[in-house]
């Protein structure tokens, strides 16, 4: 399996950006700020631009596509419930590890001050908002969930949960009306979703240049080896979280289905390799379905129902990533996230992961949503771009392993009912 061209270009841009900045941090600083950093800013803005349309399109389409669950209520209920439970577990694992290891605290106060100065206008606003959030009541997150004006909510990335709430409500309402009346608007959102995915493809074509600009500016504006140390700690924290999710899957497989965990891993290994090489749950779906049906002996009616839904709404690897990355960036900027704010990360990451497109690097766009909702500077994305692509490949392995796990659970329940 080989990297695609975009992957190679992103890695090359990271290396060239680092080398360029290490060679000339002083004389080239003004040049980089004026002529290179803007490309990174454009890339970040394009990610923020597509975040709300992605949530609207993918969630409304995803929920309305579950119409068939009314015919398969038993299988559908088990499938959705299990997927949501594993996603909540994934976010919780990420939050637990990042709060214990604290990778963002590995940088010195000097480096933190330089970062805050570099992104001062954004970070100070976020810090003030975080302090205000600490003084809110226990039910304030529930109040904030329901928008008083959807147009106003959609105009500000800070109100992502309100957009998610409206999108899910809209999709459920489409299911509840006669299909003949729902068809025109469903066709619209199906097409709208395809357009959004194509826009994401176009944005990610620009990714190597954006990553280059962000990395070059980051190293020039905060030139400290602490950043490399903190990135290493962040990467290790995330990889540990992903490894723990694999262990949790194996325990679930053993305890609920009685299967041998080693045999389970051997059966889905080819699908994991494809997932690692493509970074796409959707591209891996045919291989996953083949391995689950022919090597895990899951009935075709179960695998053909559970796995396509999983490729859309089950992004456990992405969920671990959202939690670790969001808190890591907050720690790096010296933001103290309250318990309520971290609960908000669980709900936002869970719901946003459902709306995540099963395409490479969709997690970055979802992370924009989580950061905005939690009041964390989106500019902090520059901190993790350098290592995101290889970690994205690992996240996808966890995503499809979770899909295979849930399919075996649903198969077990179906057999017990029969």
Residue locations for each model-derived region?
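Membrane-embedded helical hairpins/re-entrant loop segments and their flanking transmembrane helices
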Residues: 252-310, 329-338
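Signature of multi-pass transmembrane helix bundles
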Residues: 19, 25-28, 32-33, 44-47, ...
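Membrane-water interface of transmembrane alpha-helices in multipass transporters/channels
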Residues: 28-35, 73, 224-233, 257-269, ...
């Amino acid at each position: 399996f080989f990297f695609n061209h975009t992957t190679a270009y992103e890695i090359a841009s990271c290396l060239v950006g680092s080398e360029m900045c290490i060679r000339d941090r002083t004389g080239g600083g003004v040049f980089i700020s004026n002529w290179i950093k803007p490309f990174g800013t454009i890339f970040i803005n394009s990610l923020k631009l597509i975040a709300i349309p992605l949530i609207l399109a993918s969630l409304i389409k995803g929920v309305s596509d579950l119409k068939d669950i009314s015919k398969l209520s038993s299988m559908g209920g088990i499938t959705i419930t299990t997927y949501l439970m594993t996603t909540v577990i994934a976010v919780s694992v990420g939050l637990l590890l990042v709060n214990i290891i604290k990778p963002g605290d590995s940088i010195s106060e000097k480096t933190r001050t330089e970062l805050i100065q570099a992104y001062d206008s954004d970070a100070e606003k976020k810090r003030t908002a975080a302090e205000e959030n600490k003084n809110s009541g226990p039910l304030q997150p529930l109040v904030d969930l329901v928008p008083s004006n959807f147009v106003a909510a959609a105009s500000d990335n800070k109100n992502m949960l309100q957009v998610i709430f409206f999108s899910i409500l809209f999709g459920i309402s489409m299911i509840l009306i006669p299909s003949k009346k729902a068809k025109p608007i469903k066709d619209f959102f199906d097409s709208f979703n395809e357009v959004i995915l194509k826009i994401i493809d176009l944005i990610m074509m620009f990714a190597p240049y954006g990553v280059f600009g962000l990395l070059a500016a980051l190293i020039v504006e905060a030139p400290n080896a602490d950043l490399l140390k903190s990135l290493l700690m962040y990467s290790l924290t995330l990889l540990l979280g992903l490894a723990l999710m694999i262990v949790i899957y194996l325990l679930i497989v053993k305890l609920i289905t009685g299967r041998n965990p080693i045999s389970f891993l051997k059966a889905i290994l080819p699908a994991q390799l494809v997932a690692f090489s493509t970074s796409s749950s959707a591209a891996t779906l045919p291989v996953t379905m083949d391995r689950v049906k022919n090597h895990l002996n899951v009935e075709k009616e179960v695998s053909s129902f559970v796995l396509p839904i999983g490729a859309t709404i089950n992004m456990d690897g992405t969920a671990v990533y959202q939690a670790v990355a969001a808190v890591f960036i907050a720690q790096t900027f010296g933001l103290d996230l309250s318990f309520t704010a971290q609960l908000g990360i669980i709900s936002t990451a869970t719901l946003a992961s459902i709306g995540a497109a099963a395409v490479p690097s969709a997690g970055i766009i979802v992370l924009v949503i989580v950061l905005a909702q939690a009041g964390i500077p989106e500019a902090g994305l520059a901190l993790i771009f350098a290592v995101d692509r290889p970690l994205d490949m690992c996240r996808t392995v966890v995503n499809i392993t979770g899909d295979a796990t849930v399919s075996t659970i649903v198969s077990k329940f179906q057999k017990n009912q029969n």
